[in-house]
Amino acid sequence: SYSAARSDFFRYLLMYKEGGVYLDLKSSCSVHFDSILHEEDEFIICGWENETGQKYEGYGKNQHLKYLKYGEYQQWNIIAQRESPYLKAVIEEVSFRIQHYSPIKYHVGRKGVLNTTGPVPYSIAVERLIHTNQFSYRYERFAETFGLIYKNADTSVVNKNHYSLQTQ
């Protein structure tokens, strides 16, 4: 099964090949994309409003990403030019984790998805490439401040078989 892991990987491959804007099914945009996107944007990274008292307090905080001040980079939204080196790095990191998968190392169920194809390898790969200073990117601390909305759907329907409910 692990449809969420497959979806993660497919999303990275498609966005690498085609570029553009990806939003999760439950997400939306409150403004025209023209007001978000700038011609010079190659890759946009967004963080969570996850500090004490904020809307998504605690979201994206993961023991494997403690070195990132605000936790994981969001991958419910991906904005990239085609053949983005950032997405190439993500694909390589996820491929490595799939090829070397171990339930002991990466876990199973929800944790397995987060650690193998989800925000953990996504954030690790993106952060690693940021530190090379070779490629440009734009960082938006909060996605919602520039129009991206995390939950804009009835999540009881969308999440009926959500990967977070998987135990094996």
Please annotate each region the language model reported.
Residues 8-20:
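Small-residue hinge/turn detector
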Residues 1-8, 23-168:
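Glycosyltransferase-associated regions of secretory-pathway enzymes
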